[in-house]
A protein has these predicted regions:
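Bacterial N-terminal signal peptides
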Residues: 6-16
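Preference for long, amphipathic alpha-helical scaffolds in soluble/luminal domains
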Residues: 18-196
């Protein structure tokens, strides 16, 4: 009689032992990424954004090149960038110009005559330059960025114009040629990667 009771006791103990161990307090996970805390920053003061837009637009108007573009091939600082001449610098210049057009066009100051004139000069530069833009070499494919940024800038600008205007047609044709170039530059899978 003692033996069956001992067996039942040990069997019951074995069954309850894992359940008791499972009730322990779980350990804190160490692989969890903490949620960033929102900084305690006061809201913008009236006019704060207006001043920032003014400074940015004034900077772009002041630094626009005589040919209507922005940027150049000189390295500022100590960065070395793979940039075969002459196509690499031209690609950077056209991409920078398109980004500046997009920024000016999106700013609340886009209606000012000086801003309109600067964007028109930049568009003229891109319309003249983009047909000659090509890949620098097999490794340097920055022209994909330039075609993309120019397509975006021309589309944004054309959206503010009357569809029957000459300028609208010029921008539309420039945008159409960027789409054609991007289709030619697409990878075998049909997209554009970092090195397409």
């Amino acid at each position: 009689m003692f033996r069956p009771l001992t067996t039942i006791f040990l069997a019951t103990l074995c069954l309850h032992l894992p359940a008791a161990q499972g009730e322990s307090v779980p350990e804190e996970k160490t692989d969890v990424i903490p949620i960033a805390k929102i900084p305690d920053i006061s809201p913008a003061k009236p006019g704060q954004f207006d001043r920032a837009f003014r400074r940015g637009v004034d900077f772009l108007l002041k630094t626009q090149n005589k040919d209507g573009s922005w940027g150049d091939h000189r390295v500022i600082g100590t960065w070395n960038i793979l940039c075969p001449y002459p196509d690499g610098p031209l690609t950077f210049k056209t991409a920078s110009t398109a980004l500046c057009i997009a920024g000016l066009n999106a700013s609340p100051l886009h209606h000012e005559p000086a801003v309109q004139e600067a964007m028109t000069r930049a568009e003229d530069y891109l319309i003249r330059t983009m047909p000659h833009l090509k890949r620098g070499d097999a490794l340097c494919v920055y022209n994909t960025w330039a075609h993309t940024y120019v397509l975006d800038a021309m589309s944004m600008r054309a959206a503010r114009l009357a569809p029957d205007s000459l300028r609208y047609r010029e921008l539309k044709e420039c945008a159409r040629s960027q789409v054609k170039k991007l289709n030619e530059l697409a990878s075998a899978m049909g997209g554009w990667g970092y090195l397409t």
